[in-house]
Amino acid sequence: MKYLSNKSTSIYKNGETCTTTQYDFDNKNVGFAISKINGRYPEEGYFVNEGVQELIYVLEGSGSLHKKTESVSFKKGDAVLIEKGEECYWLGNCKVVTICCPAWYESQHKMIK
């Protein structure tokens, strides 16, 4: 078992509309974070995770997740699975839990204009 308090986290400002609190369990198989999204993220274009899947659980608020060919709306209590390789963007005002498998790492996260 590994325990982390909320005092041993890293906070990342991903532009003007997204702030992420990362819990670093030092485990390459799974990652955990909480993000606050206020508006569109990314502000232009799309993001893609080339190496991880993201399971999203909505803690607060609502919004939508958009791909080039489809979109899905969500609200508190909903869950969304973003497969690796999916190009998408967020639109909303929400707080979400993100569980990544394997653990999220920066070099696989790309922005697409």
PLM regions: where:
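Double-stranded beta-helix
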Residues: 2-3, 29-31, 91-113
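Short amphipathic beta-strand/extended segments with alternating polar/hydrophobic composition
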Residues: 5-6, 33-35, 73-77
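A short glycine-rich, His/Asp/Glu-containing loop-to-beta-strand
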Residues: 9-47
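Short strand-coil-strand connectors
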Residues: 26, 66-70, 93
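Short, conserved beta-strand element in jelly-roll/cupin
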Residues: 48-65
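Short acidic-glycine-tyrosine-enriched beta hairpin
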Residues: 68-85
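Glycine-rich nucleotide phosphate-binding loop and flanking beta-alpha elements
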Residues: 88
